[in-house]
């Protein structure tokens, strides 16, 4: 029985849409513009401890589309998942939270963003595939450099915040 309790556990408890918004602050006038819109997309990953061995991982996408420096539309969506992660070898929980969990949540986010933008009457914006391992490694490197420059005593990884 004790052997079962020490086996590694990784389970998806739930994937859900946590937040979504779409704004068209300059409609309807801007819809008459003939200029090609400029699209800016940003992504953020966050992980929080919900309970012992239970984590919420969210991926947020912000799509800002402008025509001649005026916002055509702004879409922001946050897709989240609740994961049970227990008994992983030392040092493995952070990479799972920063790489595997966002990779599970992200396809749902991509579909939501494309759907919301299409329902608003625009051609869909398809978010590109993301290499969450490269993103995680870049965050870790940036955090290490920042800690080297300014020792703030936090320690650990920036990916997890406690609720």
Swiss-Prot record:
Gene name, Swiss-Prot/TrEMBL: secB
UniProt keyword list: Chaperone, Cytoplasm, Protein transport, Translocation, Transport
Any one Gene Ontology cellular component term annotated for this protein: cytoplasm
Keyword Transport belongs to the record: yes
InterPro entries documented for this protein: SecB, SecB-like_sf
Subcellular location(s) of the protein: Cytoplasm
Lineage, uppermost ranks: Bacteria, Pseudomonadati, Pseudomonadota, Betaproteobacteria, Burkholderiales
Official protein name in the record: Protein-export protein SecB
Location, primary (coarse class): cytoplasm
Function text: One of the proteins required for the normal export of preproteins out of the cell cytoplasm. It is a molecular chaperone that binds to a subset of precursor proteins, maintaining them in a translocation-competent state. It also specifically binds to its receptor SecA.
MF (Gene Ontology): unfolded protein binding
UniProt record, GO biological process: protein folding; protein tetramerization; protein transport
Pfam family for this entry, one: SecB
Source organism per UniProt: Methylibium petroleiphilum (strain ATCC BAA-1232 / LMG 22953 / PM1)
Leader sequence residues: none
NCBIfam families: PRK05751.1-5, secB
């Amino acid at each position: 029985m004790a052997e079962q309790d020490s086996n590694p556990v990784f389970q998806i408890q739930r994937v859900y849409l946590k937040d979504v918004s779409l704004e068209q602050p300059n409609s309807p006038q801007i819809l008459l513009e003939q200029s090609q819109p400029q699209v800016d997309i940003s992504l953020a990953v966050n992980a929080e401890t919900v309970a012992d061995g239970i984590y919420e991982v969210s991926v947020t996408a912000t799509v800002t589309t402008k025509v001649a420096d005026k916002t055509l539309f702004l879409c922001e969506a946050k897709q989240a998942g609740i994961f049970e992660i227990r008994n992983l070898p030392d040092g493995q929980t952070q990479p799972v939270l920063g790489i595997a969990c966002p990779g599970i949540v992200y396809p749902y986010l991509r579909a939501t963003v494309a759907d919301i933008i299409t329902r608003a009457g625009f051609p869909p914006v398809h978010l590109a595939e993301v290499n969450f391992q490269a993103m995680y490694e870049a965050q870790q490197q940036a955090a290490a450099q920042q800690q080297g420059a300014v020792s703030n005593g936090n320690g650990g990884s920036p990916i997890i915040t406690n609720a």
